[in-house]
A protein has these predicted regions:
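Peptidoglycan cell-wall recognition and remodeling modules
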Residues: 25-122
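N-terminal prepro-regions of secreted/extracellular proteins
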Residues: 1-26
């Protein structure tokens, strides 16, 4: 049953209303599905709002001024290495870091999103 829920989460990772857009790469779609499955729909929506504004879910998004990198714009990006050696380019590894970060710093993705809305960063 958990496997079916995970497959459905991956399929519907693009939004609560429908399947992933065709432009999404399978790896990004998997990262979104992983996040949704791990966090649940409500917390995923908050994480999605942050990731969309920070990087548009682009795992190679890089801020040349600050050095922030990836889906969640980790600063420094090397923070993500403890979640996998492929942290520079793998959105799943980046989402694992991002979910751990928002939980450790804000308690939840929705608390992080509320902070982002007030400050324009998290």
């Amino acid at each position: 049953m958990k496997a079916l829920a995970f497959v459905l989460a991956v399929f519907f990772a693009g939004s609560a209303a429908g399947p992933v857009e065709a432009a999404s790469t399978p790896t990004v779609a998997y990262a979104k599905g992983y996040a949704r499955y791990t966090l649940g729909a409500t917390q995923y929506a908050c994480l999605d709002a942050i990731a969309t504004r920070e990087s548009h879910w682009n795992p190679l998004s890089h801020n040349r001024t600050s050095g922030a990198h990836g889906v969640g714009q980790a600063l420094p990006w090397t923070k993500m290495r403890r979640f996998g050696p492929d942290a520079w380019h793998n959105p799943v590894t980046q989402v694992k870091w991002m979910t751990a970060y928002v939980h450790a710093r804000y308690g939840s993705a929705c608390n992080a999103w509320a902070f982002w809305q007030q400050h324009g960063w998290y």
